[in-house]
């Protein structure tokens, strides 16, 4: 596949996870890609475009043609103010098959004085904005659905948080 990935500083292809622990058939494999995309900009530009985001896509792996097919967007996360502290680890739990997505604080305002409104309460900022998916480890199904109630509440995105306060 060809992806137009923003690669400024710590943006880019952030994580890859593949299903199967040796027990599943090769043609049942799913591949998860986690990357930063900023529309209408060159890959290495430090964009503050509102279309900029970190995305998790699920693909089926076509073994016959060695291709990723049927892309499905399962999670959209912020990428601003960035371009640092995007995190990026994807992990699949072999036992329950949940997907864990790590995302950093995206270079919060304490370190980037020109940006405002990006510090959230999950970063232990008392007067921060409500959680928006950044600064945590998120847990979801392979279809992108929340798993029960999260650590912070029942509403989206609170129900995705498995851990919070993650800097990078």
Describe the residue ranges of each PLM region.
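Acidic, Gly/Ser/Thr-rich repeat motifs that build Ca2+-stabilized beta-propeller blades
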Residues: 1-111
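Blade-edge beta-strand/turn elements of extracellular beta-propeller
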Residues: 1-7, 59-81, 123-168
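A detector of repeated loop/turn-to-beta-strand junctions in beta-rich toroidal repeat architectures
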Residues: 28, 46, 50-55, 119-127, ...
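Short secondary-structure boundary/capping segments
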Residues: 115-117
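Short acidic/His/Gly/Ser-rich catalytic and metal-binding motifs that mark active-site loops
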Residues: 108-113, 146-149
């Amino acid at each position: 596949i060809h992806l137009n990935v923003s690669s400024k500083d710590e943006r880019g292809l952030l994580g890859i996870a593949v299903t199967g622990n040796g027990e599943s058939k090769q043609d049942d494999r799913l591949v998860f890609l986690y990357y930063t995309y900023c529309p209408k900009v060159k890959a290495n530009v430090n964009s503050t475009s509102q279309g900029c985001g970190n995305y998790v896509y699920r693909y089926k792996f076509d073994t016959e043609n060695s291709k990723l097919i049927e892309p499905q967007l399962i999670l959209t996360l912020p990428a601003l103010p960035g371009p640092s502290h995007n995190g990026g680890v994807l992990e699949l739990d072999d036992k329950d098959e949940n997907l864990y997505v790590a995302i950093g604080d995206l270079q919060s305002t304490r370190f980037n004085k020109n940006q405002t409104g990006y510090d959230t309460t999950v970063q232990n900022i008392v007067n921060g904005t409500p959680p928006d998916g950044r600064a945590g480890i998120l847990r979801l199904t392979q279809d992108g659905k929340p798993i029960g109630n999260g650590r912070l509440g029942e509403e989206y995105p609170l129900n995705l948080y498995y851990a919070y306060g993650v800097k990078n």
